[in-house]
Amino acid sequence: METIGNFIQNMAFPTENPYKLSGDFGNSTLEPTVTAALRILHESPAPFNTEFFSRKNVDFIQKKLISETKRYTSFDIGPQNEDELIMMMAGIYVQDSTFDGNIKAGLRKLNTLVITECLKQILPGVRAYALYVRDASLPFSGGGEEAFKRPELATLKGSKVLSGFLPLDRNAS
């Protein structure tokens, strides 16, 4: 530790760039998606993780999510939130990245897992939206028409008589 004035400066934490958690991120050739993911994971750049978190792979996953959603639901969706996608990719990477030296096979495995997990969240949302749109476009037919019919004027009170009802008259002998 180093003392500057009355302040103690912790030298273990990088003071020149407090967002640099680990790894060699001074290399300007790293893509922002790779840098963000590696900072989350506290890993140094390596061929497999830089390829997995590359812009090309993120775009591939986005396109695959759009096409698979179209195939399963016939709905067109837009690209998903990239920050959430990177977090999902990082979670899958931490759980299932058993890299055996074959980058293509490892990428194929992890991409399949990421796409499957994302679709588990996307498809129910799209189906719920489709049901909402369908129900919102139909007239109300929930069987509660009698309960929700338009109100009647209060001046009509007492003018309706139930059939089969005989009022009792106490004054009658």
Swiss-Prot record:
Q: Which organism is it from?
A: Paramecium bursaria Chlorella virus 1
Role of this protein: One of the minor capsid proteins that constitute a network internal to the major capsid proteins and outside the lipid membrane. The minor capsid proteins glue and stabilize the capsomers.
Q: How does it assemble?
A: Interacts with the major capsid protein.
According to its UniProt record, where is this protein located? Virion
- The answer to whether the entry has keyword Zinc is no
Alphabetical UniProt keywords = Capsid protein, Late protein, Virion
* KW Isomerase (keyword) present: no
Q: Which InterPro entries does the record associate with it?
A: P8_CR
What turns on this gene? Expressed in the late phase of the viral replicative cycle.
Q: What is this protein called?
A: Minor capsid protein P8
What are the record's GO terms for cellular component?
viral capsid
The domain of life for this entry's organism is Viruses
